[in-house]
Amino acid sequence: MLFSKVIGHASLKARLIGNMREGRVAHAQLFMGPRGCGNLPLALAYAQYLLCENKGEADACGECPSCLQIAKLEHPDLHLIFPIFLTDKVKVCEPYLSVWREAVLDDPYLDIDHWRDLLESENKQLRMGVDIAQEIQRKLSLKSFRGGYKVMLVWLPELMDPPAANKLLKVLEEPEPGTVFLLVSTDADQLLATILSRAQLVKVLALRPTELAEALQGHYPELSQDDAMALALRSEGDLVEAMDMADNSEEEIFIFFRDWLRACYRREVPTTVEFADGFQKLGRERQKALFRYGLYLIRQCTLQWQQVPELVRVIGQEQEFVQNFSKLLTDRNADRIREELETAHGHIERNANPKVLFMDLSYRLMGLLRPR
């Protein structure tokens, strides 16, 4: 992965390259950022720059034997660790390595939900157990194939079981010479504090709307500039979310959410039952996408209600919705509506019954929007 292929983050790229050229390479670095920010492709680009045999001032050469191997994620000094569905027979990453390589080469902005779908483990927990930590130790005991750095990239280390995390900590405390750990995380709160203290933080921010809109138009040539910007604003810098909305018709999601809230406000129980049936048919990923989008809209409504319209980021039909729905917000219900949607999103992630959950949420919103 070349830095030039990573969307945005110009100043961060320059800092990473500058550190390398000045010989300031921390043995453990935590690429921390929200979903869809590009922390995985950034870490891969940094790994390629570390291992490149003919580094340029702004990027790896892309042509040397090392670069050609990394382009396929097959460099012998680049070790890849990631969460898997653990079974009695499969406890390490190796059996899934070709699948993960293919997934990342197809989409370097891969997220945990899409990885879970690829493994067909929708209702199962992806983890990294102690055997994977031992796998890390084994790989680091090998000599560098090309005599340079050995790079250990750990994707989503927050999904390590406690015993595995403790073993990783010991490796970080006593690193092998010439070893660089690249930890790629979306939730540092779940990492051991001692691991955080051993790693240099590389903070990766969400993509800027202009950067994201440009990337969307490059991927979807049929998108107008206005539509691309609308998706960029709605996804709040999350490329994965923006592309999911582009693939699944964000207008349909908006209409579903708007009309459902209208039914809740009017206390139209039969209509909300119909919406619950429709919600159940969406599938788990689109159900989660609906709640994420709904949370975005509610945040915009809250900003409008708080009389800071200059911070509101909506266009088109959403503007009318925000102006109207914000009039229903009060000190009593504004935070509660957001909390209910966040809770519902979490329950869907944990495989709650979609129809039961949606009806329960509908009744709760009825009470918040029009208390008796």
Q: At which residue positions do the language-model features occur?
A:
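Conserved strand-to-helix beginnings and helix N-cap segments that scaffold or border functional pockets
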Residues: 162-166, 288
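Clamp-loader machinery-focused feature within the broader ASCE/P-loop NTPase space
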Residues: 2-163
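Conserved adenine-binding aromatic site and its adjacent loop/helix in ATP-hydrolyzing domains
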Residues: 138, 170, 197
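Charged, glycine-rich active-site and insertion segments that engage polyanionic ligands
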Residues: 1-49, 55-58, 65-69, 177-180, ...
